[in-house]
């Protein structure tokens, strides 16, 4: 196996073609070995196999486009009453329509913008709307914190995750983006990580029963670096229903693209942003480069745009979607 840390020190911006070939060869070995190893562990009852093995891909890379409702955060109402939702600049239904208007394959119905009360009839109406418009519901997202210590707040986060697993199953949304959380004041990262892993494992038990994937996002806190998120992955029990949500703009490390390369093999959902932050300094994202990273990992699934910049999303998003579409097509040729 390549010592990627050593490669990073000697060349902070990229891997050589030779090194990338070696990495892909090692990754392929893991991918072909992973299904059998996991199956054997399930039969034997062994607990030694962890979820740290890269995702087993059954074919080459294939990517589809979606848009996160968070992209219209300035227009949508968070957990509003029916009256507040009706008065908003945009509703979830209008967001779905917008995704169809710009010819996306899917739409991410981020949980924050659902009304306070979510009856089954409401979820069914959204599912119907998406289907009639030819859109997949590519996923959803929750703002959980699994680093919290035992107590009411932690229980609320666990219950929220369970509730949204049910909602996702009803919607036909295959995956939920989940967060890890941050270290509470006066606590240690190791203790917070252990609680996070426990929360993921508990939630996975239910998610697997409902047929919903949980994708851990690199979202600051104890997932600020690839090293941190890999430590969490190593602690989570082996499950085909768990993986990473690769966020192209959340790493604020010296070389975010290097960190994205490290977590790409574990990715089951991906989202891109218009801006990256090497050393915390904003610069225009190299969308082609992020798509290439996913391509090398043989990623198959949705690439979701999550727009957060200052320009009005209605004018900025179509251009970004076209750039993403062009990047995907250039990688396929």
Please state what every model-predicted region is.
Residues 15-170, 191, 198, 243, ...:
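N-terminal pre-domain/capping segments
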Residues 58-59, 132-135, 206-212, 235-241, ...:
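Short helix-capping segments at alpha-helix termini
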Residues 63-69, 107-109, 137-142, 176-178, ...:
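Hydrophobic faces of well-ordered beta-strands that scaffold small-molecule active sites
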Residues 67, 99, 130, 168, ...:
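Conserved, mostly hydrophobic/aromatic
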Residues 98-104, 170-171, 203-212, 296-299:
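A structural motif corresponding to the C-terminal end of an alpha-helix
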Residues 106-107, 197-293:
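Acidic/histidine-rich catalytic cores of soluble enzymes
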Residues 168-188, 210-219:
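Active-site groove signature of glycoside hydrolases
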